[in-house]
Amino acid sequence: MKKPTNYPTTMKQLKTATDIVSLCVIGLLTGQASALSLTLIDGSVGAVAAGNTLTAAVQAPASGINVDGSSIIYQGTAIQGQTQAATYTGFSLAPSSGSTPTLNLGDGIFLTSGSANIPPTNTTNSFSNALLQPGSGSNLLLTTLSGFNTNDANALSFDFTVDPGVTSVSANFIFGTDEFPTQSVTDIFGFFVDGVNYAKFSGGELISNTPNNPTNFISNPVGSGLYSIEYNGLTKAFNVVGILDSGLTTHTLTIGVADTSDSIWDSGVFIGGLKAGTATGGGGIGTTPDGGTTLILLGGALAGIAGLRRRLA
């Protein structure tokens, strides 16, 4: 399908638009390795360049989604030196011990409520990058979803069309947070298709650390070295499916995370593989096998880049 001419479709165009600068650093921990590579997006590149880069990176090859380039909206910090979002490759986190799963995810984007420049090990229970005020502000969809004021929102939104017969869109994600397991004021993730959020656990809980869903997270305690990543809590790799509004010819997708009520203790979502599909019913999330391919759909009844590319290990 032909994309609008103002939408960057080649790496040459993307590099020209965003001035990508990469520095690869590889590290290994004894008995454990990670190939997660982040290309950080500096706030100074501007919302247009950041939005174009993230929109291209979140989609699967031959996604079947025709993005209206003029509709792309990126919400994130605009301050030089602040890196709230990133693109990523090679997400594969193997546990150092025990029976917890290896977490694998296809390439995509990383949105956070603070900093995407996360440490390669879990060193603190309160990793936080309080964005220089006024930060990135609130997000109406996430505020309405959570029922609380939101701050430090990091969101990507765009309009798109699909071929006849397409009824859904889907993506694969892992949500991580340093709010787990102790905080009652928590961050939130939303995946909104035509205004409806489909990012819910199978029991209907929102994707956030709340007292009602501790079993939905894998614990990664400080000092345990279980996973080579900062966050205290991680979800499994999930596939989220959103059902398109059949009454619309142009659809809207919004992906976002935010702090609720405060501006501290970071969370983030790794998400990619966005593509069109033919699912019907209520949508929702389900687990994915290695590599981020859909295994089973659960919850059917649930209604410039001034980048540092590095490897976390």
Q: What positions do the PLM features span?
A:
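Short, charged juxtamembrane terminal tails flanking transmembrane helices
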Residues: 310-313
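Bacterial N-terminal signal peptides
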Residues: 19-29
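Aromatic (Trp/Tyr/Phe) and Gly/Pro-enriched flexible surface segments
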Residues: 36-286
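N-terminal secretory signal peptides that target proteins for export/translocation
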Residues: 1-14
